[in-house]
Amino acid sequence: YVVTRVGQNGQSEYYNVEEYYRVRYTNTRMYLLNFERTMEEIFRGENDSISGNSILLGIRSKDVEYQTNESGKVVTFVQEGELWSYNQEANTLAKVFSFRGYEGVDDRENYGEHDIKIVNIDEAGSIDYIVYGYMNRGIHEGTVGIAVYHYDSLANTNEEQVFIPSSQSYEVMKSELGQLMYVTESGAFYIMVDGNVYGIDLNSLDTKVLVEGLSDEAVAISESNRFLAWVDPSAVRGSDTIHMIDFSTEKVTDVTGSASDYVKPLGFMQEDFV
């Protein structure tokens, strides 16, 4: 639920609150075994949000999804389902992406079954990022999937590069999305969704499917996400060949056993394949 209060500057402040109760019932009474409450402030980007070299995000968890450009002069961060960008030299704060409007908070806009992952940020402050989960509004409203966006900081414009629909729930997507996400210096972006590996050229916006139908039990990903090893989905428990792709070159190498051996990827030790 949402709570609101009037801040010191007279502006309305909004907070998303979640409560967790663990109870046990008997024939005679009810016991409260555990209670937890979390509160996250909906960042509004008001004038008092910046103090010296700090951005005051308000009440929230200490784990902030953020990235800076190489010089450290531009920082982009995620707060309660919104993406923001702050330019230290210009002392400007921009809301890059949000499903919410600027006046108040309603249930449709504030439905929190989505999240944002920052892919990269260049020296000019332009950002590539993905929005995944349930789409609250826009042309994909009511669907679940992954949208890849590019924000041009000079023009202050957002462009959707590709939308990948998904049959998974937001919670499943959230747990699986971190499995594979890799960006090359040339601007190629790789991501795995629903067992399919997609390659997206962030310059031309071309999208292709590299691998389809992967099973979790027959996939291994290196620590940097640069390498992916897998066996054919049709032979998960009886394959004599492991395929391994290097996303920096898209080169595929096959590792084979003897005629009577089956092979299976176990994992990586950093970048070394096991």
PLM regions: where:
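Repeated scaffold domains used in trafficking and secretory/extracellular systems
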Residues: I59-Q67, G104-I121, S167-Y182, E212-S224, ...
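Short beta-strand elements that form the blades of beta-propeller/WD-repeat-like
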Residues: V64-Y86, K117-V148, G178-V193, N225-V236, ...
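Exposed beta-sheet edge and beta->alpha loop/turn motif
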Residues: Y1-R29
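Hydrophobic pocket-lining residues within nucleotide cofactor-binding pockets
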Residues: V3-T4, F247, Y262
